[in-house]
């Protein structure tokens, strides 16, 4: 479970039966929660090696770099692991917005349906499909 590295104890993330771990992206300055996604080992390794957030899309069944299409990258400054080692936080600098709907955070709606954020971009313009 743990690997020793000098004076540090390296943590081995516990991926679920599908090889995934939930990842919360959190703004490193404001501490706002930006999004929840999933990562496999390859995504975590790429995040560590490149410094940019990578995730695994469960709906598309593929690895993806946050912002690869929109340009709204997440520069990862630190990766935190919870006490059970089965959830991760990426502390990030978010370029523009995290949510594909155009909001800074994917958590822009309250349970009663009211919107608590401001749309930062038009998704129809950013995600134009080439014909």
Swiss-Prot record:
Keywords: Amino-acid biosynthesis, Cytoplasm, Histidine biosynthesis, Hydrolase, Magnesium, Metal-binding, Zinc. InterPro entries: PRA-CH, PRib_AMP_CycHydrolase_dom, PRib_AMP_CycHydrolase_sf. It catalyses: 1-(5-phospho-beta-D-ribosyl)-5'-AMP + H2O = 1-(5-phospho-beta-D-ribosyl)-5-[(5-phospho-beta-D-ribosylamino)methylideneamino]imidazole-4-carboxamide. It is found in: Cytoplasm. Pathway: Amino-acid biosynthesis; L-histidine biosynthesis; L-histidine from 5-phospho-alpha-D-ribose 1-diphosphate: step 3/9. Zn(2+) binds at residues 83, 99, 106. Mg(2+) binds at residues 82, 84, 86. Binds 1 Mg(2+) ion per subunit. Homodimer. Belongs to the PRA-CH family. Catalyzes the hydrolysis of the adenine ring of phosphoribosyl-AMP. This is Phosphoribosyl-AMP cyclohydrolase. The gene is hisI.
């Amino acid at each position: 479970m743990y690997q020793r590295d000098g004076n540090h104890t390296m943590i081995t993330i516990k991926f679920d039966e599908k090889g995934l771990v939930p990842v919360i992206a959190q703004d490193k300055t404001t501490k706002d929660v930006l999004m929840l996604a999933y990562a496999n080992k390859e995504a975590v390794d790429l995040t560590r090696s490149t410094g940019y957030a990578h995730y695994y899309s469960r709906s598309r069944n593929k690895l993806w770099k946050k912002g690869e299409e929109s340009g709204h990258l997440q520069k990862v400054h630190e990766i935190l692991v919870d006490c059970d080692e089965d959830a991760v936080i990426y502390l990030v600098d978010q370029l523009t917005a995290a949510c594909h709907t155009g909001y800074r955070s994917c958590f822009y709606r309250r349970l009663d349906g009211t919107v608590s954020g401001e749309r930062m971009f038009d998704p129809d313009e950013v995600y134009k499909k080439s014909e």
